[in-house]
């Protein structure tokens, strides 16, 4: 604004008129002729007089808009040179031109203003006649205004017009500044909206990435349920699933009842047939009037809602359900459990990890995922597994409990929720302590005791891989570590805490399993052995052997690391000696030279 206003600043020139200082102000838009006329008016000379300006040291000054400004102490002297004789036509033409220029927006840009003389005095003798003083007051009617008076009036009018013009210019500048501020405020507002939009886009991109990862890791089935989309509903197939009904051999049926069953030998369709066989073999289809076609649809829909994670996938679901099935036969659970309890145990085992995303509860809570927010950080995955299970069962085509009375369904629902939530390892110590208290006086007729026992049973089945033979159990360790590493890599990239047992730079297969077997698996199965002694030989003995095997593997790993350190130390020492020899040789060569 400062530079803008300075462009309209007029120039002031001080004239010495016979000892009287006259200040003349004119705009930079005036031309030389206009400035000369203004000086003539100021000195009282006719307008057509040619004058010259002299400095205090009698140097001539060019009369034009770029002439140097002076001060009261160094005024210019005005010296008339000649008077121009103009014809009437030329004078009229100049007058007309002057009248037209007065109509311009800046009101005859020539004259800005005059100041009254500060000091009075006489003109130098021998020069032009002094200008007569005008009488006070207005002219009488009919009296012609003298040219000098007319010029003075024109000058005053020009000054007033210039002031008005400047005022209008200031208003225009104010309006321009106001408009500029409005534009800036609008830009600030738009930038703020952009920030909000960017954050929303980041959130949408994150959701899209998770959805794409979920889609790529799962089979293409119309009955998908994703926790990323609340509006997606299950649309189970209304036709009979097309997987073939395998006729299981007696050897397979016998092996299926044992914990040593090799779960890696079977394709998904074969595993579905095995699960279907379990429901028939345990009498659940008969006792609860389950429609065989509905059972197949339900199993197929469950299969399609397990993701293709390295560990938490449909094969893991089958592994847990098969271990539960084998424990029913090994421990003769049907002698002390009702068929309703067996149905709850088997169905909860099948549904316990539905739609598992491959990232555990710790990640869900630290990353503040939708599941953690929805379930308030309380077992978000286990709550989600329950929700998906009952959303599938809510579809008539998949409701295997459709012929069970409402009270019975309520009991099944409550039992399944209790068991699936018990698979959260964060509750392991709490559940174990409660079960140990009840073990002293365990009562099969006590509902609380039975509920705790069922919770322990599903926990045993969920983490029972090391109970199986080494060739069956060991691949599961690789799968679990792969899923752990996938999570820890993502946690590192997102700046989240990383558990040491998941960090690929810190954990090995041996270190990952030794602590888990010694402090989680063995104590839990030892507690179960007190109720079911037959578990010791079939399940506890393999755990002891597995612990010993991994401890031996750890000793080998430690020995290899120690050997590697020694090798590295020797290599570095040899390298240093070689460098010393090279330096000695160079020094000796230098001495010889």
UniProtKB/Swiss-Prot annotation:
Pathway: Purine metabolism; 3',5'-cyclic GMP degradation; GMP from 3',5'-cyclic GMP: step 1/1
Reaction catalysis annotation: 3',5'-cyclic GMP + H2O = GMP + H(+)
Protein name: High affinity cGMP-specific 3',5'-cyclic phosphodiesterase 9A
Binding site for Mg(2+): 353
List of residues that carry Phosphoserine: 379
Similarity-based family: Belongs to the cyclic nucleotide phosphodiesterase family. PDE9 subfamily.
InterPro entries in the cross-refs: HD/PDEase_dom, PDEase, PDEase_catalytic_dom, PDEase_catalytic_dom_sf, PDEase_CS
Enzyme Commission identifier(s): 3.1.4.35
Regulation of its activity: Specifically inhibited by a compound named 3r ((R)-2-((1-cyclopentyl-4-hydroxy-1H-pyrazolo[3,4-d]pyrimidin-6- yl)amino)-N-(4-methoxyphenyl)propanamide); the inhibitor forms a hydrogen bond with Tyr-484, Ala-512 and Gln-513.
Required cofactor(s): Zn(2+); Mg(2+)
Keyword check for Membrane: yes
Phylogenetic placement of the source organism: Eukaryota, Metazoa, Chordata, Craniata, Vertebrata
A GO BP annotation: cAMP-mediated signaling
Function text: Specifically hydrolyzes the second messenger cGMP, which is a key regulator of many important physiological processes. Highly specific: compared to other members of the cyclic nucleotide phosphodiesterase family, has the highest affinity and selectivity for cGMP. Specifically regulates natriuretic-peptide-dependent cGMP signaling in heart, acting as a regulator of cardiac hypertrophy in myocytes and muscle. Does not regulate nitric oxide-dependent cGMP in heart.
SUPFAM superfamilies in the record: HD-domain/PDEase-like (SSF109604)
